[in-house]
Swiss-Prot record:
CDD domains in the cross-refs: cupin_PpnP-like
GO cellular component term of the entry, any: cytosol
Known catalytic reactions: a purine D-ribonucleoside + phosphate = a purine nucleobase + alpha-D-ribose 1-phosphate; adenosine + phosphate = alpha-D-ribose 1-phosphate + adenine; cytidine + phosphate = cytosine + alpha-D-ribose 1-phosphate; guanosine + phosphate = alpha-D-ribose 1-phosphate + guanine
Ranges annotated as spanning the membrane: none
Pfam families in the record: Ppnp
InterPro entries assigned: Ppnp (IPR009664), RmlC-like_jellyroll (IPR014710), RmlC_Cupin_sf (IPR011051)
Function: Catalyzes the phosphorolysis of diverse nucleosides, yielding D-ribose 1-phosphate and the respective free bases. Can use uridine, adenosine, guanosine, cytidine, thymidine, inosine and xanthosine as substrates. Also catalyzes the reverse reactions.
EC number, as in UniProt: 2.4.2.1, 2.4.2.2
GO molecular function: guanosine phosphorylase activity; purine-nucleoside phosphorylase activity; thymidine phosphorylase activity; uridine phosphorylase activity
Gene (UniProt): ppnP
Name the UniProt record assigns to this protein: Pyrimidine/purine nucleoside phosphorylase
Family to which this protein belongs: Belongs to the nucleoside phosphorylase PpnP family.
Enzyme class: transferase
């Protein structure tokens, strides 16, 4: 078992990845900014503290997810994020 450290977007997003009972998971923090992520497998993003403003690939509307809320993204897709304040998240790879 190991912990994988990741840094994206010049340090604007940092995460720690691990495997729990056969499921890949990462937890991290996003600083204010705009980010686009691609997915290989389906993902569930839960907001631990803060808010993420999300637009999934192929959709027109931006949706805000606050502390305690989550959204799911299909595999082989992408999503855009707007982050107004530093936000902690949990990403589960489904």
């Amino acid at each position: 078992m190991s912990i994988k450290e990741n840094s994206y977007f010049a340090g604007g997003v940092k995460s720690l990845g691990f495997n729990q009972q056969g499921q890949d998971v990462s937890v991290g923090v996003m600083l204010p900014g705009e980010y686009t992520f691609g997915t290989q497998a389906p993902e569930r993003m839960s907001v631990v503290k803060g808010a993420l403003i999300v637009k999934k690939a192929g959709e027109v509307d931006w949706v805000t997810y606050n502390t305690g809320e989550f959204f799911e993204v299909e595999g082989s897709s992408s999503f855009e994020l707007q982050v107004k304040d530093a936000t902690a998240y949990l990403c589960e790879y489904l």
